[in-house]
Amino acid sequence: AADPRLVREGLATLGQHYPALKGLAVAHAWGGLIDSTPDGIPVISAVDTMPGLYLSTGYTGHGFGIGPGAGRLAADLVAGDPPIVDPHPFRYSRMIDGTDLGEPGMM
């Protein structure tokens, strides 16, 4: 659930930066966990050390928009079909093989 104090603080800050929005009411607020990877790129991949296990995760809250393409890539990988896009950037192994993932951060 959203923290009411943080919602109030956010609205107050919004009103400071955009005076026309001062006093704005919020009809609904959401709070929860968002999965992310250190480099902000989803993992859509087999896990080489666990045959038969495939991951599709790390969408940082953007899964709705990229879901159709990500789902197609995941389905292609599981079925052994030619992938719709190059799966290399989405490989799980980049998390454990020393690949430079950049500075950790939030997307």
Q: Which functions belong to the PLM regions below?
A:
Residues A1-G52:
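Active-site lid/adjacent beta-loop-alpha segment flanking the redox-cofactor pocket in flavoenzymes
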Residues D48-M107:
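C-terminal lid/capping helical subdomain adjacent to the catalytic/cofactor pocket in oxidative enzymes
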